[in-house]
Amino acid sequence: MKIPLAVILGPTGTGKTDLSLELAKYLPVEIVSVDSMQVYQGMDIGTAKPSLEDRKRAPHHLIDIVPPDYFFTVAEFKERALKAIDEIYERGHYPLLVGGTPLYYKVLFGEFSIPHVPPDLEFRKKMREIAEREGEYKLYEELKKVDPKTASKVHPRDLKRIIRALEVYHKVGKPISEIAGEKKEDRFFVSKIGLYMPRELHYKILEQRVDKMIEKGLIDEVRNLYLKGIDERFVSMQGIGYKELLKYLKGELTLEESIDLIKKRTKEFVKRQYTWFKKYKDIHWFDVSQYSLSQLAKLVYNTIINDWESQGYRYQDQEGVDKVND
């Protein structure tokens, strides 16, 4: 049985959450978070999680599901996401995938499989010490030697993925690219919606976004985690905003330096997100600066229905179509 689902993706700060909640007025959806950081409990401000009030407007899945000291793998994401998708459809609702983690989408839609190799925390600690001492490019050069195929697809500063690839090679003696063979799946009727905005406007919004997070208490959020023993050893603390403020709390950076670094790295990450997403050929892109939220939701609704029907799924809620077209 093929399941109809929709995807709202795009770089950080483009309004994916707002659109998903507006779309829920027209389409009976449950939202599945496709965000590698929102899975962690106690990390709310820096990950821009939907508020508890927002989560009452539509059911949400894969948010706050593991503690911050837990190593949440891509393979586990796929398993949990597929389970949520099946259960949502069984309840008579439509799965709406929302988030900006490209690797999660690639795995979920079967573009490649992920090896089930448990984490080696000691190995990771050694790798991070090397990166701190000799620079991130040292590890990237090592990855190029043992797994050039993966290295060609990973940004030289994407330390988390570089260390994971080296870890897999260290534990099983094979490149992760060799284990993660290509594997296409055709389980879904899919409509992919992408959000973007002009770069200058986007960067301005990103800077304001960081300032608002600081005002909301991001420093205290990081401090509380640090006092509980959650530091740079854990994957959760590698998220942008957390690792920079951790350096401030440890006296390695001033507050101004750490905030400037958060803004800089957020912009760099957004550039990489645009690069990743632009590789997909089947995304309907919308410039969010050109529409009100209500206008955009109606356009996206009709795009989703048209996509499903062009793939052979007949959407039955004619009342909903009329309401959107009014």
From Swiss-Prot:
Instruction: Please list where the region (Interaction with substrate tRNA) is annotated.
Output: 35-38
Q: What is its EC number?
A: 2.5.1.75
**Residues annotated to bind ATP:** G10, P11, T12, G13, T14, G15, K16, T17
Q: Which PANTHER family match?
A: TRNA DIMETHYLALLYLTRANSFERASE
Its annotated function is as follows: Catalyzes the transfer of a dimethylallyl group onto the adenine at position 37 in tRNAs that read codons beginning with uridine, leading to the formation of N6-(dimethylallyl)adenosine (i(6)A).
Annotated family = Belongs to the IPP transferase family.
Q: What is this protein called?
A: tRNA dimethylallyltransferase
